Protein backbone atom coordinates (compact mmCIF):
# COMPACT_ATOMS: atom_id res chain seq x y z
CA UNK A 1 0.00 0.00 0.00
CA UNK A 2 1.38 3.40 -1.03
CA UNK A 3 0.99 6.58 1.00
CA UNK A 4 -0.61 9.04 0.78
CA UNK A 5 -3.92 7.30 0.05
CA UNK A 6 -6.05 9.05 -2.57
CA UNK A 7 -9.60 9.53 -1.26
CA UNK A 8 -10.57 12.61 -3.25
CA UNK A 9 -12.09 10.98 -6.35
CA UNK A 10 -14.87 13.57 -6.42
CA UNK A 11 -12.26 16.28 -7.09
CA UNK A 12 -10.69 14.36 -9.96
CA UNK A 13 -9.74 10.83 -10.94
CA UNK A 14 -6.58 9.36 -12.42
CA UNK A 15 -6.93 8.47 -16.08
CA UNK A 16 -7.66 4.77 -16.52
CA UNK A 17 -4.68 3.09 -18.27
CA UNK A 18 -7.04 1.81 -21.00
CA UNK A 19 -8.10 5.41 -21.63
CA UNK A 20 -4.52 6.70 -21.74
CA UNK A 21 -3.66 3.96 -24.23
CA UNK A 22 -6.45 5.07 -26.58
CA UNK A 23 -5.51 8.75 -26.22
CA UNK A 24 -1.89 8.13 -27.14
CA UNK A 25 -3.01 6.79 -30.50
CA UNK A 26 -4.31 10.26 -31.43
CA UNK A 27 -1.27 12.47 -30.94
CA UNK A 28 1.78 11.78 -33.09
CA UNK A 29 2.50 11.67 -36.83
CA UNK A 30 1.96 7.91 -36.98
CA UNK A 31 -1.30 8.28 -35.04
CA UNK A 32 -4.74 9.71 -35.66
CA UNK A 33 -3.70 13.37 -35.32
CA UNK A 34 -5.82 15.06 -38.01
CA UNK A 35 -8.35 17.85 -37.63
CA UNK A 36 -11.88 16.37 -37.71
CA UNK A 37 -13.05 19.46 -39.62
CA UNK A 38 -10.59 18.77 -42.48
CA UNK A 39 -12.97 17.23 -45.00
CA UNK A 40 -10.56 17.06 -47.91
CA UNK A 41 -8.25 14.19 -46.87
CA UNK A 42 -7.91 10.94 -45.01
CA UNK A 43 -6.31 12.45 -41.88
CA UNK A 44 -9.44 14.52 -41.31
CA UNK A 45 -11.81 11.65 -42.09
CA UNK A 46 -10.08 9.33 -39.65
CA UNK A 47 -10.14 11.97 -36.93
CA UNK A 48 -13.82 12.63 -37.58
CA UNK A 49 -14.55 8.92 -37.36
CA UNK A 50 -12.79 8.72 -33.98
CA UNK A 51 -14.89 11.65 -32.72
CA UNK A 52 -18.09 10.00 -33.99
CA UNK A 53 -17.26 6.77 -32.16
CA UNK A 54 -16.63 8.68 -28.91
CA UNK A 55 -19.83 10.69 -29.34
CA UNK A 56 -21.71 7.40 -29.65
CA UNK A 57 -20.02 5.95 -26.56
CA UNK A 58 -21.05 8.98 -24.50
CA UNK A 59 -24.61 8.97 -25.88
CA UNK A 60 -24.95 5.24 -25.13
CA UNK A 61 -24.08 5.64 -21.45
CA UNK A 62 -26.79 8.27 -20.93
CA UNK A 63 -29.49 7.10 -23.36
CA UNK A 64 -29.17 10.01 -25.77
CA UNK A 65 -28.94 10.45 -29.53
CA UNK A 66 -25.29 11.15 -30.47
CA UNK A 67 -26.45 14.28 -32.31
CA UNK A 68 -27.54 15.66 -28.93
CA UNK A 69 -23.99 15.59 -27.55
CA UNK A 70 -22.02 18.85 -27.84
CA UNK A 71 -18.35 18.75 -26.83
CA UNK A 72 -17.02 21.45 -24.49
CA UNK A 73 -13.87 22.03 -22.44
CA UNK A 74 -15.47 20.56 -19.31
CA UNK A 75 -18.50 20.69 -17.02
CA UNK A 76 -17.89 24.32 -16.06
CA UNK A 77 -18.21 25.36 -19.69
CA UNK A 78 -21.19 23.04 -20.15
CA UNK A 79 -22.98 24.66 -17.20
CA UNK A 80 -22.20 28.14 -18.55
CA UNK A 81 -23.29 27.24 -22.08
CA UNK A 82 -26.52 25.61 -20.88
CA UNK A 83 -27.61 28.32 -18.46
CA UNK A 84 -26.45 31.43 -20.32
CA UNK A 85 -27.32 29.87 -23.67
CA UNK A 86 -30.90 29.02 -22.66
CA UNK A 87 -31.45 32.23 -20.68
CA UNK A 88 -30.29 34.39 -23.58
CA UNK A 89 -32.32 32.49 -26.16
CA UNK A 90 -35.59 32.39 -24.20
CA UNK A 91 -35.41 35.75 -22.39
CA UNK A 92 -38.33 37.16 -24.39
CA UNK A 93 -40.52 34.51 -22.72
CA UNK A 94 -39.41 35.49 -19.23
CA UNK A 95 -36.40 36.27 -17.07
CA UNK A 96 -36.92 34.04 -14.04
CA UNK A 97 -34.55 31.16 -13.20
CA UNK A 98 -34.74 28.68 -10.31
CA UNK A 99 -31.73 26.86 -8.85
CA UNK A 100 -30.61 25.66 -5.41
CA UNK A 101 -28.14 26.99 -2.85
CA UNK A 102 -26.13 23.76 -2.93
CA UNK A 103 -25.33 23.75 -6.65
CA UNK A 104 -21.75 23.75 -7.90
CA UNK A 105 -20.13 27.17 -8.23
CA UNK A 106 -20.20 26.82 -12.03
CA UNK A 107 -24.00 26.99 -11.78
CA UNK A 108 -24.27 29.51 -8.92
CA UNK A 109 -21.76 31.99 -10.33
CA UNK A 110 -23.31 31.73 -13.79
CA UNK A 111 -26.70 32.58 -12.24
CA UNK A 112 -25.12 35.48 -10.33
CA UNK A 113 -23.79 36.82 -13.63
CA UNK A 114 -27.25 36.57 -15.18
CA UNK A 115 -28.67 38.48 -12.20
CA UNK A 116 -26.26 41.30 -13.05
CA UNK A 117 -27.67 41.20 -16.58
CA UNK A 118 -31.23 41.67 -15.34
CA UNK A 119 -32.47 38.12 -14.75
CA UNK A 120 -34.32 37.19 -11.57
CA UNK A 121 -32.96 34.07 -9.81
CA UNK A 122 -34.59 32.11 -6.98
CA UNK A 123 -32.15 30.05 -4.85
CA UNK A 124 -33.93 27.20 -3.05
CA UNK A 125 -32.62 25.96 0.31
CA UNK A 126 -32.65 22.15 0.57
CA UNK A 127 -33.88 20.14 3.55
CA UNK A 128 -31.30 19.26 6.22
CA UNK A 129 -30.39 16.04 4.37
CA UNK A 130 -29.60 18.02 1.22
CA UNK A 131 -32.69 17.02 -0.77
CA UNK A 132 -34.75 19.74 -2.48
CA UNK A 133 -38.35 19.96 -1.26
CA UNK A 134 -40.41 19.53 -4.43
CA UNK A 135 -43.34 21.48 -2.96
CA UNK A 136 -41.03 24.46 -2.49
CA UNK A 137 -39.80 24.08 -6.05
CA UNK A 138 -43.37 24.02 -7.31
CA UNK A 139 -44.27 27.10 -5.28
CA UNK A 140 -41.28 28.96 -6.75
CA UNK A 141 -42.38 28.35 -10.35
CA UNK A 142 -43.95 31.39 -12.01
CA UNK A 143 -45.40 32.29 -15.40
CA UNK A 144 -42.12 33.97 -16.36
CA UNK A 145 -39.90 31.07 -15.21
CA UNK A 146 -37.87 29.90 -18.20
CA UNK A 147 -35.21 27.66 -16.64
CA UNK A 148 -34.66 25.36 -13.66
CA UNK A 149 -31.12 24.15 -12.90
CA UNK A 150 -30.89 21.47 -10.22
CA UNK A 151 -28.00 19.00 -10.08
CA UNK A 152 -28.27 15.22 -10.03
CA UNK A 153 -25.69 14.40 -7.36
CA UNK A 154 -24.13 16.90 -4.97
CA UNK A 155 -20.33 17.00 -5.15
CA UNK A 156 -19.78 17.51 -1.41
CA UNK A 157 -22.34 15.28 0.29
CA UNK A 158 -23.33 12.92 -2.53
CA UNK A 159 -27.12 13.23 -2.17
CA UNK A 160 -29.20 12.36 -5.21
CA UNK A 161 -32.00 14.68 -6.31
CA UNK A 162 -35.20 13.32 -7.87
CA UNK A 163 -34.46 14.62 -11.37
CA UNK A 164 -37.20 12.47 -12.93
CA UNK A 165 -39.98 14.17 -10.94
CA UNK A 166 -38.43 17.63 -11.31
CA UNK A 167 -38.29 17.02 -15.06
CA UNK A 168 -41.99 16.12 -15.16
CA UNK A 169 -42.85 19.29 -13.20
CA UNK A 170 -40.84 21.47 -15.58
CA UNK A 171 -42.14 19.82 -18.76
CA UNK A 172 -45.76 20.24 -17.59
CA UNK A 173 -45.16 23.99 -17.32
CA UNK A 174 -43.01 24.40 -20.42
CA UNK A 175 -39.92 25.27 -18.36
CA UNK A 176 -36.48 24.17 -19.56
CA UNK A 177 -34.69 21.84 -17.12
CA UNK A 178 -30.88 21.74 -16.88
CA UNK A 179 -29.08 19.10 -14.81
CA UNK A 180 -25.42 19.15 -13.80
CA UNK A 181 -24.63 15.42 -13.91
CA UNK A 182 -20.89 15.75 -13.30
CA UNK A 183 -20.93 13.58 -10.18
CA UNK A 184 -23.59 11.08 -11.24
CA UNK A 185 -22.66 9.97 -14.74
CA UNK A 186 -21.09 6.51 -14.61
CA UNK A 187 -22.22 6.10 -11.00
CA UNK A 188 -26.01 6.12 -11.38
CA UNK A 189 -28.05 4.96 -14.37
CA UNK A 190 -29.11 7.90 -16.56
CA UNK A 191 -31.56 7.40 -19.40
CA UNK A 192 -32.30 10.62 -21.25
CA UNK A 193 -34.78 8.84 -23.52
CA UNK A 194 -36.99 8.47 -20.42
CA UNK A 195 -36.06 11.54 -18.35
CA UNK A 196 -37.72 14.89 -19.07
CA UNK A 197 -34.38 16.67 -18.94
CA UNK A 198 -33.56 19.24 -21.63
CA UNK A 199 -29.91 20.09 -20.93
CA UNK A 200 -27.34 17.98 -19.06
CA UNK A 201 -23.68 18.71 -18.27
CA UNK A 202 -20.93 16.06 -18.26
CA UNK A 203 -17.19 15.95 -17.77
CA UNK A 204 -14.39 13.49 -18.51
CA UNK A 205 -12.16 13.77 -15.47
CA UNK A 206 -14.58 12.61 -12.75
CA UNK A 207 -14.92 9.25 -14.44
CA UNK A 208 -11.31 8.23 -15.28
CA UNK A 209 -11.09 10.28 -18.45
CA UNK A 210 -8.80 13.27 -19.11
CA UNK A 211 -9.24 16.80 -17.75
CA UNK A 212 -10.18 19.59 -20.14
CA UNK A 213 -12.99 17.80 -21.94
CA UNK A 214 -16.71 17.73 -21.23
CA UNK A 215 -20.02 17.64 -23.03
CA UNK A 216 -23.45 19.21 -22.97
CA UNK A 217 -26.54 17.20 -23.86
CA UNK A 218 -29.00 19.39 -25.80
CA UNK A 219 -32.39 17.75 -26.40
CA UNK A 220 -33.65 17.52 -30.00
CA UNK A 221 -37.26 16.38 -29.35
CA UNK A 222 -38.75 18.70 -28.18
CA UNK A 223 -36.01 20.86 -29.65
CA UNK A 224 -34.13 23.02 -27.18
CA UNK A 225 -32.35 26.09 -28.52
CA UNK A 226 -29.35 27.73 -26.88
CA UNK A 227 -27.35 30.76 -27.86
CA UNK A 228 -23.67 30.01 -28.52
CA UNK A 229 -21.19 31.53 -26.06
CA UNK A 230 -18.10 30.69 -28.10
CA UNK A 231 -18.02 31.89 -31.70
CA UNK A 232 -15.81 30.80 -34.57
CA UNK A 233 -15.91 28.08 -37.18
CA UNK A 234 -19.41 26.92 -36.31
CA UNK A 235 -18.28 23.54 -34.96
CA UNK A 236 -20.69 21.35 -32.93
CA UNK A 237 -23.81 22.44 -34.84
CA UNK A 238 -22.93 26.07 -34.24
CA UNK A 239 -23.32 25.73 -30.48
CA UNK A 240 -19.63 25.56 -29.58
CA UNK A 241 -16.91 26.63 -32.00
CA UNK A 242 -13.32 25.47 -31.71
CA UNK A 243 -11.21 22.67 -33.19
CA UNK A 244 -12.19 19.41 -31.54
CA UNK A 245 -9.37 17.93 -29.39
CA UNK A 246 -9.53 14.40 -30.77
CA UNK A 247 -7.26 12.81 -28.12
CA UNK A 248 -9.36 14.26 -25.29
CA UNK A 249 -12.64 13.28 -26.92
CA UNK A 250 -11.43 9.74 -27.61
CA UNK A 251 -10.34 9.54 -23.96
CA UNK A 252 -13.72 10.69 -22.71
CA UNK A 253 -15.48 8.24 -25.03
CA UNK A 254 -13.40 5.30 -23.84
CA UNK A 255 -13.95 6.30 -20.19
CA UNK A 256 -17.72 6.37 -20.78
CA UNK A 257 -17.60 3.01 -22.57
CA UNK A 258 -15.78 1.44 -19.62
CA UNK A 259 -18.22 3.06 -17.18
CA UNK A 260 -21.19 1.53 -19.00
CA UNK A 261 -19.64 -1.93 -18.73
CA UNK A 262 -18.35 -1.73 -15.17
CA UNK A 263 -20.72 0.66 -13.39
CA UNK A 264 -22.87 -1.93 -11.68
CA UNK A 265 -20.07 -4.05 -10.19
CA UNK A 266 -17.94 -0.99 -9.39
CA UNK A 267 -20.72 0.78 -7.51
CA UNK A 268 -21.56 -2.33 -5.49
CA UNK A 269 -17.89 -2.60 -4.50
CA UNK A 270 -17.66 1.08 -3.57
CA UNK A 271 -20.89 0.95 -1.57
CA UNK A 272 -19.39 -1.87 0.51
CA UNK A 273 -16.17 0.10 1.06
CA UNK A 274 -18.00 3.31 1.93
CA UNK A 275 -20.21 1.48 4.44
CA UNK A 276 -17.12 -0.16 5.91
CA UNK A 277 -15.55 3.28 6.39
CA UNK A 278 -18.68 4.72 8.02
CA UNK A 279 -19.10 1.65 10.25
CA UNK A 280 -15.49 2.14 11.32
CA UNK A 281 -15.94 5.71 12.58
CA UNK A 282 -19.64 6.16 13.41
CA UNK A 283 -19.42 4.87 16.99
CA UNK A 284 -17.07 7.70 18.04
CA UNK A 285 -18.57 10.54 20.06
CA UNK A 286 -19.90 13.63 18.29
CA UNK A 287 -19.51 12.23 14.78
CA UNK A 288 -22.20 13.21 12.27
CA UNK A 289 -22.99 12.00 8.77
CA UNK A 290 -23.73 14.80 6.32
CA UNK A 291 -26.22 14.00 3.61
CA UNK A 292 -28.07 10.73 3.40
CA UNK A 293 -26.67 7.20 3.01
CA UNK A 294 -29.95 5.89 1.58
CA UNK A 295 -30.42 8.71 -0.94
CA UNK A 296 -26.73 9.08 -1.67
CA UNK A 297 -24.28 8.07 -4.36
CA UNK A 298 -22.16 5.05 -3.22
CA UNK A 299 -18.73 6.67 -3.44
CA UNK A 300 -19.04 9.79 -1.23
CA UNK A 301 -18.98 9.95 2.57
CA UNK A 302 -19.07 13.38 4.22
CA UNK A 303 -18.57 13.35 7.99
CA UNK A 304 -18.32 16.06 10.65
CA UNK A 305 -16.07 15.44 13.66
CA UNK A 306 -17.30 17.95 16.23
CA UNK A 307 -14.77 19.88 18.35
CA UNK A 308 -12.00 19.28 15.86
CA UNK A 309 -10.90 22.12 13.60
CA UNK A 310 -11.15 21.01 9.96
CA UNK A 311 -7.80 22.42 8.86
CA UNK A 312 -5.89 20.78 11.72
CA UNK A 313 -7.73 17.56 10.98
CA UNK A 314 -6.61 17.64 7.35
CA UNK A 315 -3.02 18.25 8.50
CA UNK A 316 -3.28 15.35 10.96
CA UNK A 317 -4.57 13.17 8.14
CA UNK A 318 -1.71 14.06 5.82
CA UNK A 319 -1.44 10.40 4.78
CA UNK A 320 -4.92 10.75 3.30
CA UNK A 321 -5.80 12.91 0.32
CA UNK A 322 -9.21 14.15 1.47
CA UNK A 323 -10.95 17.50 1.36
CA UNK A 324 -13.23 19.69 3.39
CA UNK A 325 -15.72 21.17 0.99
CA UNK A 326 -14.99 20.95 -2.74
CA UNK A 327 -11.64 21.44 -4.44
CA UNK A 328 -13.03 24.50 -6.20
CA UNK A 329 -13.64 26.31 -2.93
CA UNK A 330 -11.33 24.47 -0.50
CA UNK A 331 -8.60 27.04 -1.14
CA UNK A 332 -10.58 29.53 0.95
CA UNK A 333 -10.91 29.06 4.70
CA UNK A 334 -14.66 29.69 4.57
CA UNK A 335 -16.73 26.75 5.81
CA UNK A 336 -18.46 24.83 3.03
CA UNK A 337 -21.42 26.81 1.66
CA UNK A 338 -23.14 23.51 0.90
CA UNK A 339 -23.07 22.43 4.55
CA UNK A 340 -24.08 25.91 5.72
CA UNK A 341 -27.09 25.73 3.40
CA UNK A 342 -28.16 22.53 5.19
CA UNK A 343 -28.51 24.65 8.34
CA UNK A 344 -25.28 23.47 9.92
CA UNK A 345 -23.32 25.62 12.38
CA UNK A 346 -20.02 27.12 11.23
CA UNK A 347 -18.17 24.96 13.76
CA UNK A 348 -19.66 21.71 12.52
CA UNK A 349 -19.23 22.70 8.87
CA UNK A 350 -15.59 23.54 9.60
CA UNK A 351 -14.96 20.10 11.07
CA UNK A 352 -16.26 18.17 8.09
CA UNK A 353 -14.26 15.88 5.84
CA UNK A 354 -15.33 14.49 2.47
CA UNK A 355 -14.03 11.02 1.72
CA UNK A 356 -14.64 10.08 -1.91
CA UNK A 357 -13.73 6.59 -3.09
CA UNK A 358 -13.04 5.27 -6.55
CA UNK A 359 -11.89 2.58 -8.93
CA UNK A 360 -8.46 2.08 -7.36
CA UNK A 361 -9.50 2.28 -3.67
CA UNK A 362 -8.76 -0.94 -1.76
CA UNK A 363 -10.10 -2.51 1.43
CA UNK A 364 -6.64 -2.23 2.94
CA UNK A 365 -6.66 1.54 2.34
CA UNK A 366 -10.07 1.89 4.00
CA UNK A 367 -8.92 -0.03 7.08
CA UNK A 368 -5.81 2.15 7.32
CA UNK A 369 -8.03 5.23 6.99
CA UNK A 370 -10.31 4.13 9.83
CA UNK A 371 -7.34 3.55 12.13
CA UNK A 372 -5.74 6.88 11.22
CA UNK A 373 -8.97 8.86 11.67
CA UNK A 374 -9.72 7.30 15.05
CA UNK A 375 -6.21 8.02 16.34
CA UNK A 376 -6.08 11.57 14.96
CA UNK A 377 -9.50 12.59 16.27
CA UNK A 378 -8.65 11.28 19.72
CA UNK A 379 -5.33 13.12 19.74
CA UNK A 380 -6.73 16.43 18.46
CA UNK A 381 -9.59 16.36 20.95
CA UNK A 382 -7.17 15.79 23.80
CA UNK A 383 -5.57 19.10 22.78
CA UNK A 384 -8.87 20.95 22.49
CA UNK A 385 -10.11 23.12 25.38
CA UNK A 386 -13.57 23.10 23.76
CA UNK A 387 -13.67 19.30 23.91
CA UNK A 388 -12.68 19.40 27.59
CA UNK A 389 -15.48 21.87 28.34
CA UNK A 390 -17.95 19.76 26.38
CA UNK A 391 -16.92 16.68 28.39
CA UNK A 392 -17.49 18.67 31.60
CA UNK A 393 -21.01 19.44 30.46
CA UNK A 394 -20.51 23.11 29.58
CA UNK A 395 -22.89 24.36 26.86
CA UNK A 396 -20.39 25.91 24.46
CA UNK A 397 -23.05 27.99 22.71
CA UNK A 398 -23.99 29.76 25.95
CA UNK A 399 -20.49 31.13 26.50
CA UNK A 400 -20.01 34.83 25.83
CA UNK A 401 -16.50 35.24 24.49
CA UNK A 402 -14.92 38.62 25.23
CA UNK A 403 -13.64 40.55 22.23
CA UNK A 404 -10.07 41.79 22.30
UniProtKB/Swiss-Prot annotation:
UniProt: pyridoxal 5'-phosphate binding residues: 75-76, 155, 183, 203-205, 243
Keywords: 2Fe-2S, Cytoplasm, Iron, Iron-sulfur, Metal-binding, Pyridoxal phosphate, Transferase
Matching Gene3D superfamilies: Aspartate Aminotransferase, domain 1, Type I PLP-dependent aspartate aminotransferase-like (Major domain)
Catalytic activity of the protein: (sulfur carrier)-H + L-cysteine = (sulfur carrier)-SH + L-alanine
Quaternary structure (record): Homodimer. Forms a heterotetramer with IscU, interacts with other sulfur acceptors.
Protein name, per record: Cysteine desulfurase IscS
Family: Belongs to the class-V pyridoxal-phosphate-dependent aminotransferase family. NifS/IscS subfamily.
Cofactor(s) in the UniProt record: pyridoxal 5'-phosphate
Subcellular location, principal: cytoplasm
Residues carrying N6-(pyridoxal phosphate)lysine: 206
GO BP: any one term: [2Fe-2S] cluster assembly
GO molecular function: 2 iron, 2 sulfur cluster binding; cysteine desulfurase activity; metal ion binding; pyridoxal phosphate binding
Membrane spanning stretches: none
Presence of keyword NAD: no
Subcellular compartments: Cytoplasm
Pathway membership: Cofactor biosynthesis; iron-sulfur cluster biosynthesis
Lineage, top ranks: Bacteria, Pseudomonadati, Pseudomonadota, Gammaproteobacteria, Enterobacterales
Domain of life according to the entry: Bacteria
Pfam families assigned: Aminotran_5
Residues reported to bind [2Fe-2S] cluster: 328
EC number annotated for this UniProt entry: 2.8.1.7
NCBIfam families, A to Z: IscS (TIGR02006), PRK02948.1 (NF002806), PRK14012.1 (NF010611)
One GO CC term on file: L-cysteine desulfurase complex
Active site, per annotation: 328
Function: Master enzyme that delivers sulfur to a number of partners involved in Fe-S cluster assembly, tRNA modification or cofactor biosynthesis. Catalyzes the removal of elemental sulfur atoms from cysteine to produce alanine. Functions as a sulfur delivery protein for Fe-S cluster synthesis onto IscU, an Fe-S scaffold assembly protein, as well as other S acceptor proteins.
Amino acid sequence: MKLPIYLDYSATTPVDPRVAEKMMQCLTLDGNFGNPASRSHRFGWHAEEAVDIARNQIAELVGADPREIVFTSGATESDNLAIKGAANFYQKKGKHIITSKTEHKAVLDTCRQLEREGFDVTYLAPKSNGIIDLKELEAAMRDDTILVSIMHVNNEIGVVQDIATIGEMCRARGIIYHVDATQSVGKLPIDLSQLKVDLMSFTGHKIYGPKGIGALYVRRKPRIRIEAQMHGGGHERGMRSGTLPVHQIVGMGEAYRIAKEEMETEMARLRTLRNRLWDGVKDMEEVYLNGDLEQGVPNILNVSFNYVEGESLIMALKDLAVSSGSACTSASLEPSYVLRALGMTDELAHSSIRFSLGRFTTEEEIDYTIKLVRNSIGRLRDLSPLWEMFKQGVDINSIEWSHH
